[in-house]
Amino acid sequence: MAVSTFSSPTPVFGIAEPPASFSSTAIGWKQPLRFRRTKKPRVISCDYSCIEVRDVCYRPPGTQLNILNGVNFSLREKSFGLIFGKSGSGKTTLLQLLAGLNKPTSGSICIQGYGDDGQPKADPDLLPTEKVGIVFQFPERFFVADNVLDEITFGWPRQKGSLQLKEQLTSNLQRAFNWVGLDSIPLDKDPQLLSGGYKRRLALAIQLVQTPDLLILDEPLAGLDWKARADVAKLLKHLKKELTLLVVSHDLRELAALVDQSWRMETGGVLVAERPPL
């Protein structure tokens, strides 16, 4: 069998092209080899979903005055939304509606899917409240257990036959602790003895165990010293890559770099798209 000699082939798309002197018949091929330059087809998927609030109004039972009036906004998945405005304007009320703690008087809160052409793919689905996590301002006021483990597993299923769910929650717990930096905290420690920053981390971990589609935070930096504020802001930057965040805050400077969309709540419960004033 003859041996062909290659002369310094030049790679094209990772494949060396043989020189013109190369004969495929020398190694037993019946047809000459043909080398074609081919490009991998580009597959672009732009499908995405948004959490959409559509013309939502809210009037507390037994009253005649709306706290929220015709609120509309759309928040794309895995993005960071910020709502700011004066105290008493209705920001926290809106968060409570999103979390399912109250129901809108009118309007809807839904998840809308979109195709790569930017058009709605189908009718929207109502936002399931079990897929929404909320961390209130000063969350330590809502702690109920005397150790970290009992606090984070409070509300887990206790009945027989729930082993598979418990195993999934345990796996989620390990991931949540890693995400928020609690893996070095003793599980038998009283959560009320944690620093302010670590109390916020614990409150975040409790919600993350449930793998929410939307995580809502009400004043996440309030009452923290400068170092804890910086740590929580850094944590939110990481979480933004994993899930959708909606934050109500007066601390605009620390959060401005994270914001993808922002709105100002005006007195009277009207929401207006606006960049945070710095």
Swiss-Prot record:
A GO molecular function term, named singly, is:
ATP binding
Please tell me whether the keyword Chloroplast is annotated for this protein: yes
Matching entries from SUPFAM superfamilies are given as: P-loop containing nucleoside triphosphate hydrolases
Residues annotated for ATP binding in this entry: G85, K86, S87, G88, S89, G90, K91, T92
Where is it located? Plastid, Chloroplast
Q: Where is the transit peptide?
A: 1-49
Q: Which family does it belong to?
A: Belongs to the ABC transporter superfamily. ABCI family.
**Which GO CC terms are listed, alphabetically?**
chloroplast; chloroplast envelope; chloroplast inner membrane
Please list the residue ranges annotated as the ABC transporter domain.
51-278
Q: Which UniProt keywords apply?
A: ATP-binding, Chloroplast, Nucleotide-binding, Plastid, Transit peptide, Transport
The Gene Ontology biological process terms listed for this entry are:
chloroplast organization; transmembrane transport
Q: What is this protein called?
A: ABC transporter I family member 11, chloroplastic
Alphabetical list of PROSITE patterns matching this protein: ABC_TRANSPORTER_2 (PS50893)
Show the taxonomic lineage.
Answer: Eukaryota, Viridiplantae, Streptophyta, Embryophyta, Tracheophyta
Q: Which CDD domains match?
A: ABC_cobalt_CbiO_domain1
Which Pfam families does this UniProt record tie to the protein?
Answer: ABC_tran (PF00005)
